């Protein structure tokens, strides 16, 4: 299996005794700050979180996932060695859409923010897997609580856990507790050649 195809599988448990290392951390930071975006504008801020206490507080606010027994559980993907939070951001020079009303402007900027976050997080995902790490995306969190923990009023677009897998467990086993996440079937992307 190639690193690319392997990188589409999420990790839910982590080996916290290992350290990502400064070189890989810097590579992830470079990807986050240099990924392409519309008009090369900064549509997001990133929070690079290694503070275990803060990561666990965020984890406590990620309820929204149901395990195989139908019990709501926190999302263990955020318990990785490094947690990245993507915060919506608008710099003054983003406001070049001056001919739009507020609703049109908000729709365009939100689209561009999400596209930029998708590209940047994709870069991180691939870099992580190329360096022996795994990743886990999270979008099921209590927004107001996570914003308060990160001390921001801006929307948190997505969370991305990056770290070493716990090789003593299956990737769908919980990091904390003894439950198993419901595995999802692989996606099938239709490709049209012309």
Predicted regions and their residues:
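Short, flexible, mixed-charge acidic loops at enzyme active sites
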Residues: 93-102
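Short secondary-structure junction motifs
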Residues: 41-44, 130-134, 157
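Short secondary-structure boundary segments
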Residues: 88, 140, 162-164
């Amino acid at each position: 299996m190639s690193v690319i195809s392997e990188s589409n599988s999420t990790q839910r448990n982590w080996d916290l005794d290992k350290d990502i290392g400064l070189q890989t951390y810097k590579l992830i930071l470079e990807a986050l700050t240099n990924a392409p975006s519309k008009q090369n504008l900064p549509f997001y801020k990133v929070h690079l979180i290694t503070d275990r206490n803060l990561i666990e507080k965020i984890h406590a606010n990620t309820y929204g996932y149901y395990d195989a027994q139908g019990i709501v559980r926190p999302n263990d993907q955020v318990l990785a060695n490094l947690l990245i939070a993507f915060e919506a951001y608008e710099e003054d020079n983003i406001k070049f859409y001056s001919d739009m009303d507020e609703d049109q402007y908000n729709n365009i900027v939100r689209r561009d923010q999400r596209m930029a976050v998708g590209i940047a997080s994709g870069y991180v995902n691939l870099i992580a897997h190329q360096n022996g790490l795994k990743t886990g995306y999270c979008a099921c969190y209590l927004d107001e609580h996570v914003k308060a923990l990160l001390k921001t009023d801006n929307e948190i677009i997505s969370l991305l856990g990056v770290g070493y897998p716990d090789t003593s467990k299956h990737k769908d086993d919980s990091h904390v507790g003894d439950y198993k996440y419901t595995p999802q079937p692989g996606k099938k992307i239709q490709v049209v050649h012309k």
